Structure formats: C-alpha cells, structure tokens
Amino acid sequence: MSNFQHGNYHSYYSMRGGTSIIDPRLKCLPDSLFYEASVLDIGCNNGTVSAQIASIFGASFVLGLDIDHVLIQKARKHLEFVSSRIGPVRNPGSIVEDQFNYYPISSIKKFSRIPVQLQPPLNKQNFPHNIEFETADFLRWESKRKFKIILALSVSKWVHLNNHDEGIIKFFGKISSLLETNGVLILEPQGWDSYLKAAKKISVFNQTPENLKIQPDAFEHLLNQAGLVLEYSIEPQVNNSEYKNFAKRTMYIYKKKGIGIIKLLTST
C-alpha cells in the first residue's frame, strides 16, 4: 500500500488533533446520538474516535474498520492504553472526559498497560469490551449485522479516487444497506480541491480526477437515491482552536428513510 493511497496515514490524529481529549467533531453532535447505539466507523485509523464513542458516548457496540492492518494493530493498542488510563467510574452509566487522564502516562509506562481481556467493565455498556477492530476493505467486506449509526469521516475521497465513480456509488449504496431503518450516516466529505491536492501528491492518482464525472457536490443526490435523506449539516468552527485542521470540513447528517434505488449495486 504505497504512499498512503487509501488515506491510511499512521500519524493522522497526532497531526490533526487539537487541544481536546474528545474529538471536536463528536462534540458537535447531540450527546444522546450514540447512546446504546450500534456503530460502524469506516476508516477508523488508529481507533481514536471509535474508542471515544464506545466509552464517553455510551454506544452499545462499536466496530472500527480500516483497510490497513498496521492501523488496526495500533487501534487495539490504543484501546488498551486508553482504557488503562481511565480512573474509577463514579457513575456506572457513563465515563466523563476528565476520567480519561486519571492515571498518568508515567504510571502506565512504569506498571504497563492492562490487557483489554483482563479489564473489568468500565461503564454500563461494558467498555472496553463493547468495541472491536477489523482489517477490511469496506467495499468488499461482508456483514450480517446492521448498524444504527455509520461514520464516514474524511474517507469518501479515498474511496472515490481508488474506486472511481462506480466505487463511490457502491459505497453509499452499501452504507444504506448496512443501516437500520431510521439509522444515521455521519458523513464528512473532502472537497474537490482536496482531490486535486491528492492527485498531485500521490502519483497513482495523477490522472484520476479528470476521469471522474461525479464530484462531492453531487453526493446528496446519490445518497437520496440510496434512501438517505439529509437531516442537517454542521458547519466548521473556524475560530475554535480545538478544531485545528478539522475545521475545514462540514459534516452532513443523513437518515435512512427507506430502500434506495441503487441498493442493487451493493451486491455486484
């Protein structure tokens, strides 16, 4: 997998993260959105967002999926590290943000991390036992499980560049097929200028944008065809230091209303 052509940057969150323990994009969303929900995080990278949803936001189950096996290994190590640092749970129904730094990094280095399988449940949803990570190419991955919420944060560009127009259509169709009725897609698409930058930076994509007929401003139409309807969008908080580079992208919240006309593409 050369030149991180799937967006599988191994230092992504250290490069882009701001000052907050919680990912600022999650802070934009309603507190109750993930509570007791089954969640799929497509392109989970090192599992930072997945682990926060499974712990602080009280999801019943979270599956983090990434095409890069090295990142999945990092995600499992990150989960072990994060859960080892969480302090005593005052309220069994939730883990609050300040508990995440309860045990200092120095103590973890001195006494080592606690393997996830040996840790007691830290909240009502059984964290850290309510989260799994899997190496898979989403377009070729099969699942019998459906999800209440699916996240696609800064991954649509990479799906599109690697799999072209047919791939992005299939991507949205497959997301719809994996969502429960009234399930929610949280989409953070990259803009067309980001495609052009990637094409200049990664040689395998040098000619790709000019061969694409679909651009990100057409995604809403494709998602409507897949049975997903835009509920609202969240504009970037450009003056908030917590957001750092994440401030440049809008998130779109879609809800599954029914069976889309491109559902058949998910089985081809």
Curated annotation (Swiss-Prot):
Pfam families reported in the protein's UniProt record: Bin3
EC top class named in words: transferase
Recorded superkingdom: Eukaryota
Coiled-coil residue spans: none
Upper lineage: Eukaryota, Fungi, Dikarya, Ascomycota, Taphrinomycotina
UniProt keyword list: Methyltransferase, S-adenosyl-L-methionine, Transferase
PANTHER family in alphabetical order: 7SK SNRNA METHYLPHOSPHATE CAPPING ENZYME, BICOID-INTERACTING PROTEIN RELATED
Single GO term (MF): O-methyltransferase activity
Ranges for domain Bin3-type SAM: 23-258
The enzyme's E.C. designation: 2.1.1.-
InterPro entries for the chain: Bin3-like, Bin3_C, BIN3_SAM-bd_dom, SAM-dependent_MTases_sf
Entry function: Probable RNA methyltransferase.
One GO term of the biological process aspect: methylation
Gene Ontology CC annotation, any one: sno(s)RNA-containing ribonucleoprotein complex
Family per record: Belongs to the methyltransferase superfamily.
Name under which the protein is recorded: Probable RNA methyltransferase C2A9.10
